């Protein structure tokens, strides 16, 4: 599928020579990589680790940033880690193009940080939640230590650990044990710590899931804001994250990648 807002952007041989020089003159793209750089349709590029996929992505982003005609709509680049952002900082951070890519209107970061920034955090703040810490291990430990000693002992005898102290699958749902009093206490501790601003990474995605289910206009607004999406390290994106991405960027049956 051709991405509508890119219809008037063409990547030429001159652009590729320019970006090779921009990246220090140490990169030279062969014909297969040139074809990938010039492609303006949705595509899944698969290659073995170390083959230079992220380098190609950074080069393409640099060219697109140079030609980008929109001041309020941006390019969205997501990855499992911050590898794409780090490579842009390393190769292009001291250039005008690099600074453009790393600032508004573009977004380059992890899947988690994207949904936090544009879905979960705005909803939580608008509903009166303060945000203090988003960290799975720290929040597990905090909640576990808020349980009475006898309840922790009971859970340990059920072969449960600190990881039980978070919502699972949906907001308000937990991994339940046989003792209903313990279940109610777990739910109470989770709810109280969330009111105090403490969330796990997984819970933030669950809130994103909840918001996207309840507010159809949010995916449309995000698509207008980011008409093009790149996903690096796609093989590391789990099923739950893919479902969220498809909910946001898949309005016409295809991801705008």
What function would you assign to each model-found segment?
Residues 102, 123-188, 192-199:
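ATP-hydrolysis module of ASCE/P-loop NTPase motor domains
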Residues 118, 137-138, 203:
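Solvent-exposed, flexible loop/coil residues
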Residues 16-49, 181-257:
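Conserved helicase NTPase motor core
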Residues 80, 99, 134, 229-230, ...:
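Short alpha-helical linear motifs
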Residues 1-124:
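P-loop NTPase Walker
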Residues 2-20, 129-147, 207:
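Conserved P-loop NTPase motor core of helicases/translocases
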Residues 65, 93-96, 123, 172, ...:
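Residue-level detector of secondary-structure transition/capping positions
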């Amino acid at each position: 599928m051709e991405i509508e807002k890119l219809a008037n952007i063409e990547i030429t041989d001159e652009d590729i020579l320019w970006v090779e020089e921009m990246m220090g003159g140490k990169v030279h793209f062969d014909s297969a990589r040139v074809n990938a750089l010039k492609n303006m349709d949705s595509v899944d590029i698969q290659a073995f680790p170390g083959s230079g996929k992220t380098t190609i992505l950074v080069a393409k982003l640099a060219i697109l940033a140079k030609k980008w005609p929109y001041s309020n709509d941006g390019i969205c680049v997501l990855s499992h880690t911050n590898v794409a952002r780090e490579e842009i900082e390393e190769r292009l951070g001291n250039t005008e193009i690099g600074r453009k890519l790393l600032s508004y209107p573009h977004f380059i970061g992890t899947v988690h940080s994207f949904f936090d920034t544009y879905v979960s955090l705005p909803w939580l703040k608008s509903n009166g939640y303060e945000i203090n810490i988003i960290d799975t291990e720290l929040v597990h430990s905090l909640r576990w230590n808020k349980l009475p000693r006898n309840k922790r002992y009971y859970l340990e005898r059920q072969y449960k650990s600190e990881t039980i102290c978070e919502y699972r699958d949906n907001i308000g749902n937990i991994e339940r044990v046989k003792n209903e009093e313990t279940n109610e206490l777990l739910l109470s501790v989770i709810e109280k710590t969330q009111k105090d601003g403490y969330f796990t990474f997984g819970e933030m995605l669950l809130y994103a899931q909840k918001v996207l289910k309840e507010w159809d206009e949010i995916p449309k607004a995000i698509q207008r804001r980011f008409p093009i999406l790149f996903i690096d390290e796609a093989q590391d994106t789990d099923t739950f994250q893919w479902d969220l991405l498809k909910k946001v960027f898949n309005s016409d049956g295809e991801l705008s990648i």
